[in-house]
Amino acid sequence: MRIGFDNDKYCTIQSQHIRERIAQFDGKLYLELGGKLFDDHHASRVLPGFQPDSKLRMFSQLTDCIEIVIVISAEDIERNKVRADLGITYDEDVLRLRGEFMDRGFFVGSVVITHYNGQPSAKAYSERLANMGIKSYFHYLIDGYPHNVALIASDEGFGKNDYVETSRELVIVTAPGPGSGKMAVCLSQLYNENKRGVRAGYAKFETFPVWNLPLKHPVNIAYEAATADLNDVNMIDPFHFDAYGKVAINYNRAIEIYPVLNALFEGIYGENPYKSPTDMGVNMVGYSICDDEVCCQASKEEIVRRYYEATNKQVEGASNQGEINKILLLFNQAKITTDTRRCTVAAKNRQKERGCASSAIELSDGTIICSNSSELLGCSAALILNATKHLAGIDHDVKLIPQSMIEPIQKTKIEYLGGKNPRLHTDEVLVALSVLSDTDENCKKALEQLPNLRGCQVHSTVMLSEVDRKIFKKLGIGVSCEPVKNK
C-alpha cells in the first residue's frame, strides 16, 4: 500500500501540541473528543498510513497527565438509546468504554449524567455506578441553553451543576455518541473551575475537516460525504479570516455556534482566549500528510464508497434521496465518477462476462483480482480465496478447499439449520481453510496472507450478507456494493 500519511510524525507533533495548549492555561485543559478514538477507519481510508488506533497511540504518550470523563445524557438512558454499530445501549457502552480505556492504561475518573431532570432511570443508573465503585455527577437542564448566556454563565446555570472533581492536567471528555452534552460539560467545568480560582482551558479534538487543507481538497470533501446524513457543510471560517487574514476550514455547526461560545467564554473569563472556532481545535493531521497525491486518490475512492453505502441504506429503508443527492454533488466537486474506484469497474465487467454476482479487490500493489458466485461459494468467499492464493503465489487453478468438504457443510446449512443459501460465506471458508491448514501447505500459505488484505478495496455487484460485511471489516478491507439484493 502506498503511504500518504506519516503516522509516527503525527503521534509526536499532536501530543506536543496538546502539551503546548495545556501550558497556555493554568495547567488544566478540558479536551472535548469528537469522532472515533478506538477505530477511526474513515481516517485510515482517506489518509493511507494513518492507523485506526493512531489517536490512542498518540494519547499513550500523555498517559500520566490524562484523566478521562465519560458523558451520557439522562434522556438517552431514559429511552434506552442504542449504538447501531455495536447493538448495545448507551448506558452499557459507557461501561464498555471505561473498560477499554482502563485496559489500555488510562485513568477514568468519573461519569457525568447530563440533561438531568429527575429521570428515575438516570438516578438508578447513578446508583448502579456507585455500587460498582464508579463516581458519577449530575448536570442539569438549563432553560434557553445555549443562547441564554446570562443565565447559563451564572450560579443558576452552570453553577447548579455538580462540580466534577478531577486530579490531572488533561481531562478528556468523551461519550458513546453525539448529543450527549460533552461541550456543555467542558464549559460547566470552566465556569466552576474559574469560581475556584483556576483558569482552566478548553479545546476540541476533531480530525475532520482538516483546517489547513483547501476547502475543496478531496480529504475534506470525503468528510462531507461521511457526514452527508447530518448535512454537515465545510466552510471557510469567517472569524479566523477576520482575525488573521488567513483561510482555515471548519464546518457549519462549529461556525454557527461560535458567537454563542464567544459570549459564554466572555461570561466565564471576562474575555475569549480564542478568536475563531478553528483556534479552539488542536488538530495536527494536515502537517503529517507526506504524499498528497496518495491521500487525494484514497479520498476520492472513499467518496465513491460512501455513495454506495448511502444507496445500500436506501434499499434497506435507512437512508433518503437527499443524502444520495448530497454525495452526487460532492462527485462534481471532486471531479469523480463511480469508475474512479478501479475495483468497481472490474467487478461490473466480471458480472457482464459471467452473468452472475461478482466481486473484485484491488491489492496494495494495484493488482485487480476478480471472482464470481458459483454453486459452492458466494462471490465474497471466492474473492478471499482468489486474493490469498495470488498473494501466496499459488496457481489460480489450485482448489484450496475440495468439493468433498464443501458439500457436507452445505448440507448442514440447508437440511439441519434451515438455511436457504447453500453457498459458503467468507467466515465458513476461513474456518474450512484453517482446518485444512494443519495438513495442507497451500492452505497454510493462503491463511498467512490475510494480514496483507488490510487496506485493500473491494466492490461487489450485489449487497453483502451481514456476516460477509463483518469479515471484511475485521480484515480491514474497504467494501462497496451495488444497491442490488442478492437472490
PLM regions: where:
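Flexible phosphate-sensing "switch/lid" loops adjacent to ATP/NTP-binding sites
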Residues: 1-174, 189-348, 356, 363-365, ...
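Hydrophobic positions on the alpha1 helix immediately C-terminal to the Walker A/P-loop
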Residues: 185
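Residue-level structural signal for beta-strand termini and adjacent loop
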Residues: 201, 373-375
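A short, polar/charged loop-to-alpha-helix boundary motif
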Residues: 376-392
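Flexible, solvent-exposed loop/hinge segments and secondary-structure transition points
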Residues: 392-393, 414
